[in-house]
Amino acid sequence: MIKTFSIVALLITLFNFGSFAEEIQAFNFTKEEFDNLTVRKIKKKTKYTLGSNENGNFLKAEAEGQASGLGKEILINLNKTPFLNITWKVEKDLFGIDEKSKKGHDYAARVFVIKKTGSTALSNRAINYVFSSNEEIGQYWRSPFTKKSIDYVLATTKTNNNEWVTVKTNVKKDFKKLHDLDVDELNGVAIMTDTDNSKIKSIAYYQNIYFSSE
């Protein structure tokens, strides 16, 4: 499927970068928060629904040929809270696609962190932390749609299929490693499940996404 704009570019434009949000919890997955998240879609919206279990609230994402993300403007001090923590699960993955190509650039689950680096939204830099269906943990590559975003595998269904897994990464160090940037603050965060290229059905869950000092 040919895209006029990349998914990454559309997600980056979610943010106006105005107010300071003094919090380290990225998403609470409450109804109030859900109703106020900014939505950007490529063609058809991914189905997002709220739920809860013994560990708290979660967001369920279902896509079959759809692609839309949920994002918010949030200022994170990476000198104080550089670690991003994500608890997530992929119930139905996208086995067999080439995630590094334009035709296969779909992910069952992904979390974007965004840094404003220029005068326009499309000049911003992003790291796209992904729950891969085919690649190994620790692998990374530039998005086939924009050099401003790098995909970085934090989890894979090759080792964690249909089970909750919690991952942690140092975002400040990741920006230096992947973009060669010394970043003190983040400006936005977004989540997305998309299958608009592969048209395969995917189901994933997001829970307890937050930044921490250690």
Identify the function of each model-found stretch.
Residues G104-S149:
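Extracellular/luminal beta-rich ligand-recognition
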